[in-house]
A protein has these predicted regions:
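Positively charged n-region of N-terminal signal peptides that target proteins for export
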Residues: 1-4
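Signature of the catalytic double-stranded beta-helix
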Residues: 117-131
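N-terminal secretory/targeting leader peptides
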Residues: 19-115, 131-336
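N-terminal signal peptide c-region/cleavage motif recognized by signal peptidases
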Residues: 13-15
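Sec-dependent N-terminal signal peptides of Gram-positive bacterial secreted proteins and lipoproteins
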Residues: 7-11
Length: 336
């Protein structure tokens, strides 16, 4: 009987107008070098709104854009120090977590997006597992589009680029390896966040960048020519720290996966479409398209194949390069 009265008094003591406490809002901090008002971020914010709506505002992604969190190597360091929970990265940043991923960005590897999509789909499960083993959750792939040379002066063959100062993304081992295939040029190593500055100040003559990025980063005033064909494919992805992702309620994890499955493929399609539109739009800024001689393209392909082999054991294992090349060759045969 005594316990009955204790229970009764406890129940009576609860105010009738007591409110149920709302769920704690979880904030995920994400860093990227992508400019705030770019097409890339416009796509990402659609994904953000989906997450917010599906979780009734209880899960929020806060993006530190425009390099506020630093260049990609600095973003990686912030992830390690738990100052960030996730990141939107290019292949350069992804490669600092899992260097194997750079096999998808080898120069003159892919001819079109169909080849990209096919090969990436075949090795994506393996790469996801490797990211997991490094403490990261691969949320979804995105695109930068194909990457082109942009130059202050016209060139159609290798002899015309001799002595030119070419920007190389600082601390990017793949970009540095490219200089082995271009002994004629003078590399200028600098952060991508300072690229506009050194371009405007005349410190470099040639850069490599996706067309949509040239517009987003406002690099068009510093160059006059876009050189075709593209030299490589630009990879991108959204990753989260695995411990952060694993700590989320299961329903939130499912929302993130659902959002990635729904929005990221559209993100990729839009970026690819806008890449083509960007090349046309750059004409309005006086940037002319120049095509390399066929003999030059052939020579560059041969040079870059030596770069592929030189990166075995440094960026990726032999078996992975073999798998990518054989998968690509098989796709080309089947598509004929």
């Amino acid at each position: 009987m005594r316990y009955f009265w204790v229970l009764l008094i406890s129940l009576i003591s609860i105010p009738v107008n007591a409110e149920i406490q709302p769920l704690k809002v979880i904030t995920i901090r994400i860093g990227t070098i992508v400019p705030e008002r770019s097409s890339w971020m416009n796509q990402i914010y659609r994904f953000n709104e989906f997450i917010k709506k599906e979780t009734k505002g209880n899960l929020k992604f806060i993006w530190w854009t425009s390099g506020v969190a630093g260049d990609e190597p600095e973003i990686i360091e912030k992830l390690k120090r738990n100052e960030l929970d996730g990141a939107g990265l290019s292949g350069m940043g992804l490669g600092r977590i899992v260097s194997d991923v750079r096999v998808l960005e080898l120069p003159f590897l892919f001819n079109d997006y169909e080849e990209v999509d096919y090969v990436r789909s075949k090795i994506s499960p393996l790469l996801s597992k490797i990211f997991n083993s490094k403490g990261y959750e691969l949320i979804g792939w995105v695109d930068q589009g194909f990457v082109y040379f942009f130059s202050k002066e016209e060139f159609r063959d290798i002899s015309q680029i001799k002595g030119k100062r070419v920007w190389i993304w600082k601390e990017d081992p793949l970009a540095e390896a490219l200089t082995d295939g271009f002994p004629e040029v003078t590399p200028y190593f600098e952060k991508v966040t300072l690229l506009k500055k050194i371009l405007d100040e005349g410190m470099v003559d040639v850069i490599y960048f996706p067309p949509i990025g040239v517009i987003s980063f406002q690099l068009y005033y510093g160059v006059k020519y876009v050189i075709t064909p593209p030299i490589t494919y630009g990879l991108g992805a959204f990753v989260m720290k695995k411990d952060v992702f694993d700590s989320l309620p299961d329903e939130y994890k499912e929302v993130i996966r659902k959002g990635a499955d729904e929005f990221f493929p559209q993100f990729v399609r839009d970026v690819r479409r806008e890449t083509e539109e960007s090349i046309s739009a750059l004409n309005k800024f006086g940037i002319k398209k120049v095509t390399l001689n066929e003999s030059t393209v052939s020579e560059l392909r041969n040079r870059m194949r030596k770069v592929y082999d030189g990166l075995i054991g440094k960026l990726y294992p032999q078996y992975l390069l073999t798998q990518v090349l054989s998968t690509l060759a098989q796709f080309r045969v089947e598509r004929k």
